[in-house]
């Protein structure tokens, strides 16, 4: 099966918004053992949409079209599809009634413009959208099925999961015997990881893929077929052993997710004091439901005054060692933990750049501490200075990993290949 994707919208084409839908769809399909072979982005111009539908339908077996199903004049996907096939738009009575019910249920009067969303190409098969007003549909043109979805990410994800994936499995008799194991890593680049894994002799049906999403590199281990699926846990275990401390989570999208579930299930509490990470550690945990059960407070103590007045850092510590130092970050972590008697506290202070570095403490210098009831662990690391965001996100990841290792009763301070460390 040859799968393609057509993304629509002037704002996507012009780079005014990042097309996260395309990235999510490609990743999701990969997890189902299907690779996208081509992706095209086209603006909201009728003639361009018609041309791309006609041209790509000659080559693909199935095309997911995303966007252009709204009620406004620049939403042209349905009209373009009808013209590409040479047929009229007709009202889908079932969807019009669904629209009327939706507006009535929400105590709103339906604008006349929304009736446009019930107008589909004459040969279209309606595809349910259970969470929005845009009607999905599919149409056969030339050799391809074109499957139309709304641009709203939440709606797209529902339709792909509940409608699109079952459709292509049935239509193209895809083998459902596919399994996937994900390993999340930090501290090593993609090429360094590949150098370690390429020499491995993998069993038949097992393949390895890489996805860079800084500060992580995600390793995807695919197993296709019953025999490969049976040995997948063993293969994943061997790969973890080869990579050592670089692997920080298994089958989690982020290290924050790993920490969230470990704290949620442990009954232990956490406080956070952040300087250079500016609330990033706290924010990433709050993304997950239930974080209030363990996250007691997150403090952004950016100035020296706030470190002294809020966390109790000794002014002489700042005078003698500076804000970016082991001594300061240890006092920050201790102070954050003591405020509410948390089980753990993380603290960060660093130079994210692009300015502010010195010969002694260049941009990318970050001090991180973990305070526990039994003591404090700390380190001052040297991070790649490619961007301010990378320094901050890597700092958060290393802080998370220190806590993760403490929760597992492992060595808290470990070496990462691409992250240096200052001696205390």
Curated annotation (Swiss-Prot):
<dbReference type="InterPro" id="IPR036653">
    <property type="entry name" value="CinA-like_C"/>
</dbReference>
<dbReference type="InterPro" id="IPR050101">
    <property type="entry name" value="CinA"/>
</dbReference>
<protein>
    <recommendedName>
        <fullName>CinA-like protein</fullName>
    </recommendedName>
</protein>
<dbReference type="InterPro" id="IPR008135">
    <property type="entry name" value="Competence-induced_CinA"/>
</dbReference>
<dbReference type="InterPro" id="IPR008136">
    <property type="entry name" value="CinA_C"/>
</dbReference>
<dbReference type="Pfam" id="PF00994">
    <property type="entry name" value="MoCF_biosynth"/>
</dbReference>
<dbReference type="Pfam" id="PF02464">
    <property type="entry name" value="CinA"/>
</dbReference>
<comment type="similarity">
    <text>Belongs to the CinA family.</text>
</comment>
<dbReference type="InterPro" id="IPR036425">
    <property type="entry name" value="MoaB/Mog-like_dom_sf"/>
</dbReference>
<dbReference type="InterPro" id="IPR001453">
    <property type="entry name" value="MoaB/Mog_dom"/>
</dbReference>
């Amino acid at each position: 099966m040859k799968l393609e994707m057509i993304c629509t919208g002037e704002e996507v084409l012009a780079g005014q918004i990042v097309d996260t839908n395309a990235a999510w769809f490609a990743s999701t399909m990969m997890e189902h053992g299907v690779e996208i072979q081509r992706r095209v982005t086209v603006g909201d111009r009728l003639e361009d949409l018609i041309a791309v539908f006609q041209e790509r339908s000659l080559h693909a077996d199935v095309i997911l079209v995303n966007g252009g199903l709204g009620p406004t004049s620049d939403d042209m996907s349905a009209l373009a599809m009808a013209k590409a096939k040479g047929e009229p738009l007709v009202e889908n009575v079932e969807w019009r009634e669904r629209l009327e019910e939706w507006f009535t249920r929400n105590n709103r009067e339906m604008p006349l413009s929304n009736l446009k969303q019930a107008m589909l190409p004459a040969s279209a098969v309606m595809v349910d959208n259970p969470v929005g007003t845009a009607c999905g549909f599919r149409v056969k043109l030339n050799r391809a099925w074109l499957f139309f979805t709304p641009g709203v990410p939440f709606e797209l994800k529902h339709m792909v999961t509940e409608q699109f994936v079952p459709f292509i499995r049935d239509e193209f008799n895809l083998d459902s015997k596919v399994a996937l194991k994900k390993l999340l890593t930090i501290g090593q680049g993609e090429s360094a990881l590949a150098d370690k894994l390429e020499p491995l002799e993998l069993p038949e049906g097992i393949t390895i893929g890489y996805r860079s999403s800084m500060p992580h590199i995600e390793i995807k281990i695919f197993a296709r077929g019953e025999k490969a699926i049976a040995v997948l846990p063993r293969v994943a275990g061997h790969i973890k052993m080869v990579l050592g401390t670089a692997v920080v989570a298994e089958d989690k999208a982020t290290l924050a997710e790993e920490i969230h579930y470990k704290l949620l299930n442990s009954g232990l509490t956490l406080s956070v004091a952040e300087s250079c990470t500016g609330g990033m550690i706290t924010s990433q945990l709050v993304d997950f439901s239930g974080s209030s059960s363990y996250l007691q407070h997150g403090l952004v103590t950016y100035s020296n005054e706030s470190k002294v007045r809020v966390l109790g850092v000794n002014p002489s510590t700042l005078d003698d060692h500076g804000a970016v130092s082991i001594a300061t970050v240890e006092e920050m972590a201790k102070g954050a933990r003591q405020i509410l008697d948390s089980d753990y506290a993380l603290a960060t202070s660093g130079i994210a750049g692009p300015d502010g570095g010195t010969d002694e403490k260049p941009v990318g210098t970050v001090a991180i501490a973990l305070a526990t009831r039994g003591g404090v662990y700390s380190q001052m690391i040297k991070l790649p200075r490619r961007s301010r965001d990378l320094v901050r996100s890597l700092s958060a990841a290393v802080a998370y990993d220190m806590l993760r290792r403490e929760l597992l009763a492992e060595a808290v301070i470990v070496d990462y290949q691409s992250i240096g460390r200052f001696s205390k």
